[in-house]
Amino acid sequence: MVDDSTRKTLSNIPLLQIRAGPREKDIWVQRLKEEYQALIKYVENNKQSGSDWFRLESNKEGTKWFGKCWYMHNLLKYEFDVEFDIPVTYPTTAPEIALPELDGKTAKMYRGGKICLTDHFKPLWARNVPKFGIAHAMALGLAPWLAVEIPDLIEKGVITYKDNC
């Protein structure tokens, strides 16, 4: 199910060990530390390989995440807002990543711009609780979704390039 490139990407993202969600206030801070370390490592790896494609930050509690992601298509950079909340049942439940400005533009999306990850990503996440975290959700959830959906939306004329100069 996982190709060699994805397997290599995954092997370079640290696995998490602490099983805690926002409800476990005492150990949630430790889980957040692991999350940030994994995200930093993933972003560093992406930069080194020339495939830097997102920026994320969170609120103080680490329960709301937001930022930008981008996809290069025909040498043009398509940029989107990305956001998600950490579910109270995290890490058992994966975050639902949303690209609000694409809401309603593809069938592979739920209300509010939440991308569809049901068939491929969620079973993989479930098998890897608590080892997978936000970096894994970006690598195995959002990245492949962008790679499939954005070129299709561009081809159909649903989204167009915006010059940000």
Curated annotation (Swiss-Prot):
It holds the Pfam family UFC1. Disulfide bonds: none annotated. Signal peptide: none annotated. GO terms for cellular component: cytoplasm. SUPFAM superfamilies: UBC-like. Keywords: Ubl conjugation pathway. InterPro entries: UBQ-conjugating_enzyme/RWD, Ufc1. GO terms for biological process: protein K69-linked ufmylation. The active site is at residue 116. One of its GO terms (molecular function) is UFM1 conjugating enzyme activity. E2-like enzyme which forms an intermediate with UFM1 via a thioester linkage. Belongs to the ubiquitin-conjugating enzyme family. UFC1 subfamily. This is Ubiquitin-fold modifier-conjugating enzyme 1. It comes from Drosophila virilis (Fruit fly).
